[in-house]
Amino acid sequence: MNLSLILFLIGILGFVLNRKNIILMLISIEIILLSVTFLILISSLNFDDILGQTFAIYIITIAGAESAIGLGILVAFYRLRGSIAIEYK
């Protein structure tokens, strides 16, 4: 459980500290999601419950779809603006 908490905090810190780079923000969101999935798997193994493992597979599938959609939006953003940097005004 400590590893999951450490990964979650790394993801939160990466998201907060890299506010200008969209790719690093997407990677940080994926780290957060996978740390929660890891926690669900650990809990599922501790309680000997197959439902948690099924739910973890579902989360990994959704995370893959989210990554594909996010990268598609990123490509469209790059084509529109010519840069992937986020500008705050």
From Swiss-Prot:
EC number: 7.1.1.2
Primary location: mitochondrion
Subcellular location: Mitochondrion membrane
GO molecular function: NADH dehydrogenase (ubiquinone) activity
GO cellular component: mitochondrial membrane; NADH dehydrogenase complex
Domain of life: Eukaryota
Catalytic activity: a ubiquinone + NADH + 5 H(+)(in) = a ubiquinol + NAD(+) + 4 H(+)(out)
Residues that span the membrane, as ranges: 1-21, 22-42, 55-75
The entry's keywords: Electron transport, Membrane, Mitochondrion, NAD, Respiratory chain, Translocase, Transmembrane, Transmembrane helix, Transport, Ubiquinone
GO biological process, one term: ATP synthesis coupled electron transport
Xref: Gene3D superfamilies: 1.10.287.3510
Membrane topology type: Multi-pass membrane protein
PANTHER family in alphabetical order: NADH-UBIQUINONE OXIDOREDUCTASE CHAIN 4L (PTHR11434:SF16), NADH-UBIQUINONE OXIDOREDUCTASE SUBUNIT ND4L (PTHR11434)
Function: Core subunit of the mitochondrial membrane respiratory chain NADH dehydrogenase (Complex I) that is believed to belong to the minimal assembly required for catalysis. Complex I functions in the transfer of electrons from NADH to the respiratory chain. The immediate electron acceptor for the enzyme is believed to be ubiquinone.
Similarity comment text for this entry: Belongs to the complex I subunit 4L family.
Name this polypeptide is given: NADH-ubiquinone oxidoreductase chain 4L
Gene that produces this protein: ND4L
